[in-house]
Swiss-Prot record:
Disulfide bonds: none annotated. The lineage of its organism: Bacteria, Pseudomonadati, Pseudomonadota, Gammaproteobacteria, Enterobacterales. Phosphorylated by CitA. Residues 181-200 bind DNA. This is Transcriptional regulatory protein CitB. InterPro entries: 2C-system_Tx_regulators, CheY-like_superfamily, DpiA-like_HTH, Sig_transdc_resp-reg_cit/mal, Sig_transdc_resp-reg_receiver. PROSITE patterns: RESPONSE_REGULATORY. Member of the two-component regulatory system CitA/CitB essential for expression of citrate-specific fermentation genes. Phosphorylated CitB binds to two sites in the citS-citC intergenic region where it probably activates transcription of both genes. The gene is citB. It comes from the Bacteria. The modification 4-aspartylphosphate is found at D56. Keywords: Activator, Cytoplasm, DNA-binding, Phosphoprotein, Transcription, Transcription regulation, Two-component regulatory system.
Amino acid sequence: MDSITTLIVEDEPMLAEILVDNIKQFPQFDVIGIADKLESARKQLRLYQPQLILLDNFLPDGKGIDLIRHAVSTHYKGRIIFITADNHMETISEALRLGVFDYLIKPVHYQRLQHTLERFARYRSSLRSSEQASQLHVDALFNIQAREQTEPASAPLRGIDESTFQRVLQLFADPTVVHTADSLARILGSSKTTARRYLEQGVKNDFLEAEISYGKVGRPERIYHGKQTYPEQR
């Protein structure tokens, strides 16, 4: 089976590498390029014609939505998945109108991304299964493209800043590192409550694991460690 050529458009190196690491868990996908600017994305789109683009909206030299408009105007035959912190309904509505396959709001739950990639793989496989389609086949295609009711929720906790959240995850790049809400609060210069909110979001998104530790005086304390190995920012 041919691989699904994939272009990642993300200006944060660490986030781009996390996406690459996640995509590598699916053998049917092949990352053929990473663009950190709109201009570079346009060039790679023209050069590679990837079958899938994972796209951020906020780029140093423009908006990802402009790349979608450009793709539509040039009759791009692949599909686009928006992965962005942009939660404005105006952007979401236009992205839907322009035909994006899915729209994921950062910080993204790993299982949510996994579900989207699996759906896209099934969608593409179904498209290639025959030259002519029955109504049943058409119904299946549209059901695959639409999000199933069993899809996991991806709404982040309130008060989560994306850049701070990614900084917290980076602290756990070494799998031997553990933190508590107290130790993280000192690093972030925040309250213990705020630090715990980020740690619990990491657990919710399957990036971190939490355990109960009983200290020297027997008082239980919640400690956190990395569930995945994150690449160092370059």
